Amino acid sequence: MIRPSSRPLIGVSACLKENGRGGWHHTVGEKYVQAALRAAGGLPVLIPAIGPEFGDDEPAFLEAMDRLLDSLDGVLLTGSPSNVEPHHYGKESREGTLHDRARDSTTLPLIRHTIDRGVPLFAICRGLQEVNVALGGSLHQHVHEVEGRRDHRSPKSPDMDVNYAPAHDIDIAEGGLLQQLLGERRVTVNSLHAQGVDVLAPRARIEATCCEDGQVEALSVPDAPGFVLALQWHPEYKALENPVSMKLFDAFAAACRARLAARATPMLRAAE
């Protein structure tokens, strides 16, 4: 059992969802909480979608986030059924598309601030799309409608093992962060997304693409002072049973523990 004091605090991004009875909930899927707790060995802390409370006052929001990041050792950006509102990258939304304005207004500025402060960042599915948009890139809103692209959406099965089953291989960029972590140039991943990277953000580096159609599957940020890895697939699903997923969570965990140790050093000196 890992002692609580040695577990890094990992902020987990939440969505804002209507509960069907006129109320609203800040929600995080259990699989992300379990991944932060068990696969990354951390203590998960929910980051509520509070961006709208600050309106257009981004400096005030970032001041609030600074207080949060001062206490966090890592940030995990979760997947979601909702999509980033396309006005953030100069496009219009299609009727019927599910969005989460509160999450967008929280995560997009938080991503830039987290990266620039060197706080370890691990982004999954929607999280990858958020990283690309936050840093100036754009998205395909419907990858399956792009000529030459496969359908990256999952089956709609009541059996989650079917939905999260291996779907296609990815080609891992030579010499990149992902190859360094996995020691391989090709692995098989699941696929549960309708949107995907269109124009790559200037600061981002492609770490992997789908072998079948070239769609971006992983990103890093080479000029970031800390760990940044964004994945289009879902390594959190039954992560403890998947060696590839565990290598990725191990790397994130190591970065989080290093930040925990660095944060603890000044406090120990102050106590002497």
Question: Which residues are covered by each model-predicted region?
Answer:
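N-terminal beta1-alpha1 cap of cysteine-dependent amidohydrolase-like domains
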Residues: M1-F122, V133-H140, H144-L181, T188, ...
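Glycine-rich beta-to-alpha active-site loop
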Residues: A123, L128
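Active-site-proximal beta-strand elements of phosphoester/diester hydrolases
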Residues: L229-Q232
